[in-house]
């Protein structure tokens, strides 16, 4: 009976993960500049296909090239739904949601596959808690629909972790090679540690590992070079260039640096929330030692690079969640033994509530971080579709939500050129979407009127005298200008 009950709950757990990811997607439907390449590339594959001249990356290539293999996969799975939307003449904005939703389902598929292995190794309660712990944390669910290179690699990494737990070494090596060579070369630290442990424990021999690693490396490298050289119009291995730029030249430091232990005292507590408190208890089970040490070891090695972002270590969160879930299940399984376990069980439930409250707060604040996307939506609401529109989008707007999916009027012209000088050089545009800088706005006082102002967040402060107990500070970030009629 217990087995049947556990089996009956599994669809509910899967539905929980899908529902939480959907809420994050709907509340924050727009994207940031870090997601731009993969999102724009997917758009171009869906709407331009072989017409490379229309592709965004040829005009705005970015600092280093990125692989097209991820966007190709997303476009393939998104295309049926996007085709139906086009037949219904629905806005391309909904296609953006479809594309991001497909990526989210890919991540959830990886999490669900990993959950099955957790269930097989640790039991139903640990697997159930793994799903609840993961769903209530903010960053993993928030990022799972975002077209970041790290997130595109995440489904492959999760499948590799499941193969590692199953001791399916051939599958693990092939998936690892694909993730490292195609998507994120720094994954050699994380997945390499997993392989080294297997080699050290003699679960797989060096000869057998090489028998799979060599052909996997050659085929994956050949695949990415062939596909990406076609789209970039030059012989290229994107992740090789990223490795050279970020690691050898250390140019990633241009985007800021953080202290050596930042991942441990800042990123990890924010990523795991209160679930972090249950990791020591989960270590009572010796089977959790290897996943935990390897995840922390990856973070320690990656800490040597000065430029740090939470999303860079997102692969470690599921491994640590397994240990946290084991700690939670230890208390819940012993609920009837003493009042101490009863109190501990209440703490387990309470920590999920606290994590959910933090996630809701962070999601609410994040909603205001995409003024560019909001401004594009306002433009199409305020200006009649039959109007002749030539819109200029400045850098601040392009980095905070503007994408080709939001260019929904095929008769309008949208321009992101960065070489147009402010002032008289902008008079050719009927509309301007720009940063709300007083000095720049003064240049258009006599030639344009403000059609809309869009706010964004500047910070959050605690206020215990109200509910919710915080204030979100907003200020005007972008303005949408419309050119005044010229005197006849």
UniProtKB/Swiss-Prot annotation:
Pfam families: Glyco_transf_22. One of its GO terms (biological process) is dolichol-linked oligosaccharide biosynthetic process. It is an enzyme of class 2 (transferase). Changing residue 146 to Q: In CDG1G; loss of function in dolichol-linked oligosaccharide biosynthetic process. GO terms for cellular component: endoplasmic reticulum; endoplasmic reticulum membrane; lumenal side of endoplasmic reticulum membrane; membrane. Mannosyltransferase that operates in the biosynthetic pathway of dolichol-linked oligosaccharides, the glycan precursors employed in protein asparagine (N)-glycosylation. The assembly of dolichol-linked oligosaccharides begins on the cytosolic side of the endoplasmic reticulum membrane and finishes in its lumen. The sequential addition of sugars to dolichol pyrophosphate produces dolichol-linked oligosaccharides containing fourteen sugars, including two GlcNAcs, nine mannoses and three glucoses. This is Dol-P-Man:Man(7)GlcNAc(2)-PP-Dol alpha-1,6-mannosyltransferase.
């Amino acid at each position: 009976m217990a087995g049947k009950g556990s089996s009956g709950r599994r669809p509910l757990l899967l539905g929980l993960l899908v529902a939480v990811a959907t809420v994050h997607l709907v509340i924050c439907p727009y994207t940031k500049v870090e997601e731009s390449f993969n999102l724009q590339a997917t758009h171009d594959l869906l709407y331009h296909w072989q017409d490379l001249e229309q592709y965004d990356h040829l005009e705005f290539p970015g600092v280093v090239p990125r692989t097209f293999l991820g966007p190709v996969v997303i476009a393939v799975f998104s295309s049926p739904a996007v085709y139906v939307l086009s037949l219904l003449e629905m806005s391309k904005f909904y296609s953006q949601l479809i594309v991001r939703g497909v990526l989210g389902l890919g991540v959830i598929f990886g999490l669900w596959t990993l959950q099955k292995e957790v269930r097989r190794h640790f039991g139903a309660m640990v697997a159930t808690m793994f799903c609840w712990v993961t769903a209530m944390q903010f960053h993993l669910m928030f990022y799972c629909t975002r077209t970041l290179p790290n997130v595109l690699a995440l489904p492959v990494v999760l499948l590799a972790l499941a193969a590692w737990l199953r001791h399916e070494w051939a599958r693990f090596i092939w998936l690892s090679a694909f993730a490292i060579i195609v998507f994120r070369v720094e994954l050699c630290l994380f997945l390499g540690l997993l392989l080294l442990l297997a080699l050290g424990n003699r679960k797989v021999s060096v000869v057998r590992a090489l028998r799979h690693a060599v052909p996997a490396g050659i085929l994956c490298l050949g695949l990415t070079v062939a596909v990406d050289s076609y789209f970039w119009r030059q012989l290229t291995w994107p992740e090789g260039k990223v490795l050279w730029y970020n690691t050898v030249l250390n140019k990633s430091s241009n985007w800021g640096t953080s202290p050596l232990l930042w991942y441990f005292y800042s990123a990890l507590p924010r990523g795991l929330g209160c679930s972090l408190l249950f990791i020591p208890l989960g270590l009572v089970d010796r089977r959790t030692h290897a996943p935990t040490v390897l995840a922390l070891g990856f973070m320690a090695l990656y800490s040597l690079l000065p430029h740090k972002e939470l999303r860079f270590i997102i692969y470690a969160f599921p491994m640590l969640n397994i240990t946290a879930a084991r700690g939670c299940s230890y208390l819940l399984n012993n609920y009837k033994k003493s009042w101490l376990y009863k109190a501990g069980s209440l703490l387990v439930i309470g920590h999920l509530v606290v994590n959910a409250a933090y996630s809701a707060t962070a999601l609410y604040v994040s909603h205001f971080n995409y003024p560019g996307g909001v401004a594009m939506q306002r433009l199409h609401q305020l200006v009649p579709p039959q109007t002749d529109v030539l819109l200029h989008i400045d850098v601040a707007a392009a980095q905070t939500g503007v994408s080709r999916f939001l260019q929904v009027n095929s008769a309008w012209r949208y321009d992101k050129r960065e070489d147009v000088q402010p002032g008289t050089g902008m008079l050719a545009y009927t509309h301007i979407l720009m940063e709300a800088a007083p000095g720049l706005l003064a240049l258009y006082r006599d030639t344009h009127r403000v059609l809309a102002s869009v706010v964004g967040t500047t910070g959050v402060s605690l206020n215990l005298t109200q509910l919710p107990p915080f204030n979100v500070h907003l200020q005007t970030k972008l303005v949408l200008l419309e050119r005044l009629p010229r005197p006849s």
